[in-house]
Amino acid sequence: MRRRVVVTGLGAITPVGNDVATTWQALVGGVSGGAPITRFDASEFKVRFACEVKGFDAGLYMDRKEARRADLFTQYAMGAAVQAMADAGLAEGGYDPNETGVIIGSGIGGLGTMEDQHSVYLQSGNRRISPFFIPMYIADIAAGVVSMRFGAKGPNFATMSACATSAHAIGEAFRTIRYGDADVMLAGGTEAAVLPMSIGGFGNMTALSERNDSPATASRP
């Protein structure tokens, strides 16, 4: 039986705001998140600006120890998920864990962790690679960590569909509820890809704007 599907809660960690209200006001106000890259020295790169998330505090959403064992993309996912569950009135429960699932997509996953651990390997050898490297890196860990946080035991996986990843996740969640495989779904996407490898790679394939002189107006559809 096909069921009506509704959105009951929203959450957002974005380059123009770390919650839904701030993000929305920035969007309708035409505020750009573009600015020179601060996360690494991009002076020798073709592309030297990006839309970075600013002022994010993972400690608002995760235990500090848990956050240290999570790549930034997973931290962003947790922040948005906690907001969405609160917005839906489900932060304290009120849902059947067996009928609740999580689909969170990521195009690149924990690339920052990959970069860090590759440096460790080159400098100190394989025995110094963190045992947390793989679970921090894999793209489906964001969905896994969020599901553990809320005890969700329903469908749980990641989508990876390039720029359509988040929309793909939301569409899959819609169908999951519509066809009766779950009653509640947390869905969306997460990325933390302002990194040397990704900026260099996307830049060299000419997939990024090179209007470094005006980051705020570089996106021109």
For every predicted segment, state its role.
Residues 1-66, 88:
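ACP-dependent fatty acid/polyketide chain-elongation machinery
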Residues 2, 18, 28-37, 86-99, ...:
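Acyl-thioester C-C bond-transforming condensing/cleaving domain
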Residues 4-5, 69-70, 179:
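Hydrophobic alpha-helical segments, especially transmembrane helices
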Residues 10, 105-107:
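Structured loops at beta-to-helix junctions and adjacent beta-edge loops in soluble globular domains
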Residues 12, 70, 159:
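Generic anion/oxyanion-binding catalytic loop in active/binding sites
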Residues 19-22, 26, 73-80, 165, ...:
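Generic hydrophobic secondary-structure packing signal
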Residues 39-90, 113, 139-153:
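A glycine- and small-residue-enriched flexible loop/hinge segment at structural boundaries
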